[in-house]
Structure formats: C-alpha cells, structure tokens
UniProtKB/Swiss-Prot annotation:
Region called Disordered, residue ranges: 1-25
Protein name: Hydroxylase/desaturase poxK
GO molecular function: oxidoreductase activity
Similarity annotation: Belongs to the asaB hydroxylase/desaturase family.
Composition-biased stretches (Low complexity): 1-12
C-alpha cells in the first residue's frame, strides 16, 4: 500500500540557512511529563487512529512535570545494554538506506527498502536473534506541515506490557507459529533513528529498566483500531489482523521516582540508532540477569536548543525479536 504522495519535509535545509552551534550536549536537568495517578477502578486510556464513542474524549490522561536529570551517553555509548538498561546504542549504520532511496511518505517504500536493513541491524546487534518481525513504524515530526506526521511523544510511556507483548506475538505471527515462538525468548524492541540528524530538537530520553520499579508503572489502555468503544475486548490474537476490527492493548505509564536514571544521546545522527526494549520475556524468569526488561521513554525539550535549530524528524520501527535462549 502506498500513501498519498505529499512533499517530503526539507527540514535539514533550516540548518543550512543559518549558522548553528553544535547540538547541545552533556547532562541536563529538565521537566519530563508523567501521567497522573488514577484511583481504581478508574484507569487511563487513549484512542489512537480510531475515533472514540460520541461524547468520549480521545484520552483522559493528564501529564504532570517532574524535574529529571538526563545523562548524556555521548562518549560512553557502550555503558548501557539491553539486559540491564533495555537500551543500546547502534553506530556506523552506513548500510541503512535513507532519502532519497526511501520515500518516507510511502508505506510501501519504507517496508520494501528500509525494513530489511532494520531487521539486519537488529540481528547483528542482538546475539542469538533468529527472527525479527516488524509490525509497525511511526514517523514523527515537530511540525505537522507539509506532511501531517504525529509530533514527538512528550509524556513518559511504555508502549506495551507483558500481556500485550504476548498478544502481539500471537496476532502477528499466527496461531501456529506464534505459540511455538512463545516457547523461546521473545521481545519487543524499537529501532529509533533520526531522518535529518543531528538531532537538536526534542531528543529522546530513556530510563534504565534496572532503575524503574514495577510498582511505579501504571497500566493504561490503548484503543488501537476498529470502531471505538470503552468496552471493546483486549487484543484478540488472530492470524491475519484486520485493520477494521476492534483491538486494544495495555500500555505502561510510569511515575517518576528517586533513583531512576535517564539517558539520551546528544546530537544523534543518521548513522546511529537507539534500540529501546519494550519487553523481554527473560525478565520474567527466576534468577534472570535481565533487569526489568522494559524501558520507559519520552521526548523532552532541551532548554539549550538554539534558536533556529532544525525540527526533529524521526522514525520508530517496532519489532518482535525472537531467539532460542
């Protein structure tokens, strides 16, 4: 399926029109939004790409800012890893295609040209990964013109919980292959990279999973497809997902707490990427060396961003990753 042809943003040209200093670097203390608490039986919800019932708001989630020190990984990129932090930095990605080879406004072009390189990069980065299945991608931009991309997500979140990860495996891998793959190690990993780096505006902050406690993550609901309804069933595993069917899944909304460590990579470029692990089944095993297995994350506004800095334009590719270990 090819999206309607629309102009590709020429955001990089902004930096060519004026003289800019290098992107901000170093640790920074800045506000990050966290969802407010809900008292049971109430819970947070949001409708994504499908309308809510008449009279129901798209979301009831409200953010509250907390001052967070975000540590810069530049120069110490190897200090984080997936097993401890659910975060890994990839560099030297010269084989991952970019514009003009990829038309970012064409779903078909992204799937045909970009997806295989992402799959190869993840297999290379994650030991033992034998199968990588991409189930979605999202492009974000700090301006919604000339293309109506979504803006950066400016509230801390975790895209799927453990039960949602199981449903994703069954939903996308089918009723035969899905249960078999669930017998091994299964993960959800985001591949995040800029499309116009280096990033000046709204970088991504990721909390080390080893420092975020389970009881500091609230469970909310995403309504993802079909006819909206607050009583629609949780995600039903199906062999061939139908975009018109009703579907929802749990996602996580963290609270900020002392002891959490947050990271970003200053000035991340187009030959770099972040692997942000959303779920790792090995974290559920007794005596596992995987600490938490899920990285909450959020974009944030850096007060050091210079005037006239280029907009952020980025892609996040959501992957199911399977290994036998």
């Amino acid at each position: 399926m090819t999206a309607t042809a629309t102009p590709v943003p020429t955001v990089a040209s902004h930096a060519q029109d004026i003289t800019l200093p290098p992107p901000p670097k170093g640790d920074i203390t800045t506000p990050i939004l966290f969802a407010q608490d809900f008292q049971k039986p109430s819970t947070g919800y949001m409708f994504i790409k499908n309308p809510p019932p008449a009279g129901v708001p798209y979301t009831n989630i409200r953010g509250e800012p907390a001052m967070v020190t975000v540590e810069d990984l530049r120069g110490k990129e190897n200090s984080v890893n997936l097993d401890r932090d659910s975060l890994q930095v990839l560099q030297g990605l010269t084989d991952v295609p970019r514009s003009p080879e990829v038309n970012w406004n064409s779903v078909e072009s992204v799937e045909k040209t970009f997806y295989p390189a992402v799959e190869a990069a993840i297999k290379s980065a994650i030991p033992g990964a034998h199968t990588v299945h991409i189930f979605r991608h999202g492009i974000r931009h700090t301006q919604n013109w000339p293309v109506p991309y979504n803006p950066p997500a400016m509230i801390a979140h975790l895209d799927q919980t453990g039960p949602a990860a199981i449903n994703r495996v069954l939903r996308h891998m089918g009723p035969v292959e899905g249960p078999r793959l669930l017998q091994g190690r299964y993960r959800i990993v985001h591949f995040w990279t800029p499309l116009n780096g280096p990033v000046y505006t709204c970088p991504v902050a990721v909390a080390s999973s080893a420092t975020v406690k389970d009881n500091d993550i609230q469970i909310f609901v995403s309504h993802l497809g079909g006819i909206g309804g607050l009583d629609m069933p949780l995600g039903r595993p199906v062999a061939k997902p139908d975009a018109s069917e009703q579907y929802r899944e749990d996602f996580g909304a963290p609270r900020y707490a002392d002891g959490q460590r947050w990271f970003y990579l200053s000035g991340i470029t187009q030959d770099e990427a972040l692997l942000i692990q959303i779920f790792d089944s090995n974290a559920l095993q007794k005596d596992s060396t995987v600490q938490g297995g899920r990285a909450v994350h959020s974009a944030f506004r850096d007060p050091r961003t210079p005037q006239g800095a280029p907009d952020r334009w980025s892609i996040e590719v959501s992957c199911l990753v399977f290994s036998d270990e």
